[in-house]
C-alpha cells in the first residue's frame, strides 16, 4: 500500500473512531444481553464515538505509535462491567471480551465486501490496457495493489486497521481481551491474581511488543506483524477472487 496523503489520513481517522466505537459498543451490547445492564445504563450501547473515546488510548497512543514507526493500534474507554450480574461469571466475562475483537473481524469482512461492490459499480476504476489489434484488456483493481483513488485507499485502510485491532486485542496478556480466554481456563483460585495484572496497563503490553522487534531480543512484535501480513494477504486473495467473479465484463 502506497504512502497515505492528507485526505487519506482524514479518512483513516474517521475509520479509526468508527472501529473503536464498534469494538466498545460490542462489549456493552453482549454484556447487556448476558444480564449486566451496567454499560447500557451508562449509555455505552451506542455507536456514538463521544461515548467511547479515551484521550490517551484513542488519540495520543495511535499518534505515538505512528511517530515511533510501530503499527497503529488504539483503544476506547473501557466498558464498565459487573460480573456479579452474569449467570456464568468467568464464561460470560470471556464472551463479553471476545465480542470486541470479533466485531473488528466483522468489519474486516464488511470493508472487503465494500471493495467488491466498489469495483463492481465502477467507484474504483479498472485499469484498461488499449489493444489496437483486438479487445482492450481490462484489469480490475487488486486489494493487494496500489490504490487508484481515495475510496480504494479508505477501504483497504479500514480492513487493515480492523484486522490489526482484532489481532492486537486477541493477544492473551492482561488487560487485552484475549487474556479473558486464559482467565476462563484457569482454576478459580488463580483467576483473581490473573485479572489483577490488568492494573499494569496497556503500556506494558506495548513495551513488550516494542522490545519484541527483530534485533531487540524478542519476537512478540515480529509475530504480530507476521500474523497481520498473513491475514491481510489472504484477505486480499479472497477479495480479488470475488472481484474477478462478480465484476462485469
Stretches with model-predicted labels:
Residues 1-249:
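Hydrophobic transmembrane alpha-helices and their immediate loop junctions
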